[in-house]
């Protein structure tokens, strides 16, 4: 069973899709990465449905079919608010237990939601599975100073399409055929990410046992630094390093996807 629709709050429309197998053993909410959208996550959705899991996926603000300035955000707080809206709207359709999967920025959003819960409620997810989570991008120490110097003169930047997967068909599709791919990147999003880089370093230790899956050929995030930061925050963290895998683990080559 497939359900699709839009949630509206404060003028923001969120495109949401839900897949439900005949017999469900639980549910998964997928949070996609920056510059992605639900349409790129078919491999993962198929695998989860084969495991008899209900699957929820939504397009982030400014991505896919959701509204908002393309690829832009003022604060990662807005992403967390959007995630909470999706969780509330889909709660009655998602059998327990509820799992979270986040790719890159999606992992950062799931982490921020976990850290920001201070109202005494139990965390909604029984597991968080983070694929190449964004804590700090690669070469950030240099790039942040260049960004500060040039931002007053450059509200947007040319996008560089990276070789972030060994799946050549995926890379070709994203670069040449995907109508949802922006070719200019807003400086506002980089500012929001910079705030996140500082913010995650200020959070206290958390007992939640997150599960991190990371490729050792990732050239998008500073993954060694990120692992160190996450291990300092989550002493019960599980870690799986995938040899030869790049950054976009959801769309890696088929052999690597099986391991992931």
Each PLM stretch: what is its role?
Residues 1-21:
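N-terminal cap/lid segment of alpha/beta-hydrolase-fold proteins
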Residues 33-36, 216:
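Active-site glycine-rich loops that stabilize anionic/oxyanionic intermediates
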Residues 35-38, 64-94:
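Catalytic nucleophile-loop/oxyanion-hole region of alpha/beta-hydrolase
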Residues 38, 45-69:
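Conserved alpha/beta-hydrolase
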Residues 128-138:
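Active-site nucleophile loop of the alpha/beta-hydrolase fold
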Residues 206, 212-214, 218:
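Short beta-strand/loop motif that positions the catalytic acidic residue
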Residues 208, 222-231:
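Short alpha-helix in the alpha/beta-hydrolase fold that links the catalytic acid
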Residues 245-258:
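Catalytic histidine-centered segment of alpha/beta-hydrolase-like enzymes
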């Amino acid at each position: 069973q497939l359900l699709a629709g839009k949630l509206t709050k404060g003028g923001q429309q969120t495109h949401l899709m839900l897949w439900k197998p005949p017999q469900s053993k639980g549910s998964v909410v997928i949070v996609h990465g920056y510059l992605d959208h639900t349409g790129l996550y078919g491999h993962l959705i198929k695998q989860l449905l084969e495991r008899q899991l209900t699957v929820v996926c939504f397009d982030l603000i400014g991505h896919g079919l959701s509204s908002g300035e393309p690829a832009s955000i003022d604060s990662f707080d807005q992403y967390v608010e959007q995630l909470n809206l999706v969780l509330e709207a889909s709660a009655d359709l998602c059998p327990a237990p509820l799992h979270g999967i986040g790719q890159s920025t999606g992992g950062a959003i799931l982490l921020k939601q976990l850290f920001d819960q201070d109202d005494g409620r139990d965390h909604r997810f029984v597991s968080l599975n983070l694929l190449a989570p964004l804590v700090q991008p690669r070469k950030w120490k240099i790039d942040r100073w260049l960004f500060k110097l040039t931002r007053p003169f450059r509200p947007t930047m040319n996008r560089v399409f990276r070789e972030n997967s060994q799946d050549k068909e995926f890379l070709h599709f994203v670069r040449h055929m995907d109508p949802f791919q922006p070719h200019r990147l807003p400086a506002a999003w980089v500012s929001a990410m910079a705030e996140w880089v500082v913010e995650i370093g200020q959070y206290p230790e958390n007992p939640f046992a997150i599960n991190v899956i990371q490729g050792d050929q990732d050239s998008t995030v500073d993954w060694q630094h990120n692992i160190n930061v996450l291990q300092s925050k989550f002493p019960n963290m599980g870690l799986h390093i995938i040899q030869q895998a790049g950054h976009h683990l959801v769309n890696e080559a088929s052999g690597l996807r099986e391991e992931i």
